Amino acid sequence: MLPEGGRILDLGCGSGRDSLAFLKAGFAVNAVDGSAEMASAASELTGMKVEHATFADFEPKRVYDGIWACSSLLHVPAAELPAIVAKYAAALKPGGRFYLSFKLGDHDGMRNGRWFTDMTEQSFRRLIDDVEDLTVDCIEVTSDVRPGRADERWLNAWCMRI
């Protein structure tokens, strides 16, 4: 899906787990997280500089082959998602891939002290329909693999910049 050694933006990288996997697979990685603590932990884990910035404040300085937003953009209110997704889609090379995941559902609000925007396949497709030059490649609904959470469902989507 991505060229060998391609450049990936890990958007909302959390602990850096996925950034580390991408680095080990030979990709060039840039990572950013909105939590100073998580950005620091990710930097320590990966050995690379991880930027601390919100999705709204971070300005991509490169063009990417892929953007990985695993369980991260779900913390953006639904009303703000079109502008955020469009901003990052514009940082993709033509043919570049954008992975996004959301909890499956229709909730948009606070849950356990944090904001969550859940998505259905229909609401996700409507979101992407409003983003110029981005198309949905594949949507898959999966169960959470963490212990005790098999009843939680996730919407996983691969999009492509055209």
Where in the sequence are the language-model features?
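A short acidic, Gly/Pro-enriched loop at the edge of an enzyme's catalytic core
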Residues: A56-I67
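Class I SAM-dependent methyltransferase SAM/SAH-binding core
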Residues: L9, S15-D57
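A short SAM/SAH-binding and catalytic strip from SAM-dependent methyltransferases
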Residues: G66-E80
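Acceptor-substrate binding/catalytic loop of class I
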Residues: D108-S123, R146-G148
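Conserved beta-strand signature within the Rossmann-like core of class I S-adenosyl-L-methionine
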Residues: G95-F102
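Core SAM-dependent methyltransferase catalytic element
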Residues: R146-I162
